[in-house]
């Protein structure tokens, strides 16, 4: 009788683990601040409009001479890999140079990459101080445009945001981007919907 109870308990445990999917290991759980910004087509994108969706975020700018081109290339590769696996995820690129990055400029920048706007929005429509504060509060990310400079200091991470608007993980977006880990975590986050 004890053996049957033990086996039953073990089977129930295995069943629950299999049904629950994988968990995000050590989630960051940063709360994304409410926002409403403009995308490359001049349309509003907000935290509210992303509610219930899993999304990836990064910080870039169109005049970037260093890390933004490889970051955008890697995010483009990631977009293709996610689409190949039929994984539903949005991509949000926040401009860290909003004074220069108007919607038209963002669209022109994106045209340099074989990406799709189907699920990718490049955002602007805020002041420099607003994006610096938003990045710090929401993503614990530093964004700073030194006075008199045309380059902006910013994080090079990709961020996974869950359907509840919390940042779950961050990943290197420049070197050795962990595509398989990101895809696995996106799948896990999708079970939280």
From Swiss-Prot:
Q: Please indicate if the UniProt record lists Protein transport as a keyword.
A: no
Mutating residue 64 to S: effect? Abolishes cytochrome c oxidase assembly
Q: Where is the lipid attached (S-diacylglycerol cysteine)?
A: 19
Its domain of life? Answer: Bacteria
- Disulfide bond positions: none
Listed GO cellular component terms? plasma membrane
Q: Where does Cu cation bind?
A: 64, 68, 154
Q: How does it sit in the membrane?
A: Lipid-anchor
Q: Where is the lipid attached (N-palmitoyl cysteine)?
A: 19
Q: Which residues form the signal peptide?
A: 1-18
Record's function text: Necessary for insertion of copper into the active site of cytochrome c oxidase. May play a role in copper homeostasis or redox signaling.
Which family is this protein grouped under? Belongs to the SCO1/2 family.
Per UniProt, subunit arrangement is: Monomer.
Protein name, UniProt field? SCO1 protein homolog
């Amino acid at each position: 009788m004890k053996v049957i109870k033990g086996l039953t308990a073990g089977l129930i445990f295995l069943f629950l683990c299999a049904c629950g999917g994988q968990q995000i290991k050590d989630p960051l759980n940063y709360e994304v601040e409410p926002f409403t910004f403009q995308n490359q087509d001049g349309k509003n994108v907000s935290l509210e409009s992303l509610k219930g969706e899993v999304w990836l975020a990064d910080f870039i700018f169109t005049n970037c001479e260093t890390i933004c081109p490889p970051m955008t290339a890697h995010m483009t590769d990631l977009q293709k890999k996610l689409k190949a696996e039929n994984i539903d995820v949005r991509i949000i690129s926040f401009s860290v140079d909003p004074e220069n990055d108007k919607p038209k400029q963002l669209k022109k920048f994106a045209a340099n990459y074989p990406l799709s706007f189907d699920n990718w929005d490049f955002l602007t429509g805020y002041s420099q101080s607003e994006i610096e504060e938003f990045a710090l509060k929401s993503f614990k990310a530093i964004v700073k445009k030194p006075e008199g400079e045309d380059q902006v200091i910013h994080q090079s991470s990709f961020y996974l945001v869950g359907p509840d608007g919390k940042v779950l993980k961050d990943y290197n977006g420049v070197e050795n981007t962990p595509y398989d880990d990101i895809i696995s975590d996106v799948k896990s986050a999708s079970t939280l919907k």
